[in-house]
């Protein structure tokens, strides 16, 4: 049997929607990263972009274990003197819940030229409404093969 070269295929990208209510942040981010990369497809190649679109709803209702709400910190620097910014996960969930999921997924993707392409296909919303109804997204929870760790 010959190996399929994904570069020569006409890749049809699916749209998936997932409700993050009550889901663990790390497990959810792992699943999303794998779908964005296309690891669930039989013709996956690490150097070819074959992934799908993912819509995440209710980003503010994710859960974390242990004391991560108070102990986990997000740090960034503005490149100005005294410009170190530090925020806890609890503050981020109250003010920027979309950013929490976006950062968790981004840090699970490979750090190469494809990372920016993968991240463009991730859509995160705090409420239960989204503006991608025209793409007819599939509910990810119905696909049990991808959802085995939850």
Curated annotation (Swiss-Prot):
Key words, A-Z: Ribonucleoprotein, Ribosomal protein
Transmembrane segments: none
UniProt name for this protein: Large ribosomal subunit protein uL13
Record lineage: Bacteria, Pseudomonadati, Aquificota, Aquificia, Aquificales
UniProt-listed GO biological process terms: negative regulation of translation; translation
Keyword hit for Ribonucleoprotein: yes
A Pfam family assignment: Ribosomal_L13
Family: Belongs to the universal ribosomal protein uL13 family.
């Amino acid at each position: 049997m010959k190996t399929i070269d994904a570069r020569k295929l006409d890749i049809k990208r699916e749209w998936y929607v997932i409700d993050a209510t009550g889901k663990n942040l790390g497990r959810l981010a792992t699943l999303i990263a794998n779908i964005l990369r296309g690891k669930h497809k039989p013709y996956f190649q690490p150097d070819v972009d074959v992934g799908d679109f993912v819509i995440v709803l209710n980003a503010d209702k994710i859960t974390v274990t242990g004391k991560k709400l108070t102990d986990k910190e997000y740090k960034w620097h503005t490149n100005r003197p005294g410009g170190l910014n530090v925020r806890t996960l609890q503050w981020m969930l109250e003010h920027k819940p979309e950013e929490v999921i976006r950062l968790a997924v981004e840090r699970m993707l490979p750090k190469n030229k494809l990372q920016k392409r993968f991240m463009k296909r991730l859509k995160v919303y705090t409420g239960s409404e989204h503006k991608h109804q025209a793409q007819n997204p599939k509910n990810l929870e119905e696909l049990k093969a991808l959802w085995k760790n939850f």
